[in-house]
């Protein structure tokens, strides 16, 4: 079995305290095999000057509205916000909306988001959800 070891100044495990000069061992499929404090041989260890932490979760998303980023007037209250969504929802062609959904999936994953809960009112995000490396749930 091929093993990959990466290390950083700190490793933040899912449970437990941060580990100074910690490491994470992975198998060839990316499954975590072991986490611990780095001691001894480090020649085959990939070191990163920073921290390693579990993937982040976006627990409330409306990915289908990605095309509306930076389009809302501020300080309109909840009813004003909802009115803007209703007015702008179909303001871009479907192909553009789907491309922007994929762009936002790629951006979130690149920034460390590995799981997402999406509140969806249409099927425009379904193809991107099938292709993403992120774990997704749709409500």
Annotate each predicted stretch with a short phrase.
Residues 1-41:
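N-terminal metal-binding scaffold of metallo-dependent hydrolase/deaminase domains
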Residues 9, 60, 112:
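Residue-level signal for inorganic ion chemistry
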Residues 66-99, 137:
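Active-site gating loops and adjacent loop-to-helix segments of metal-dependent hydrolytic enzymes
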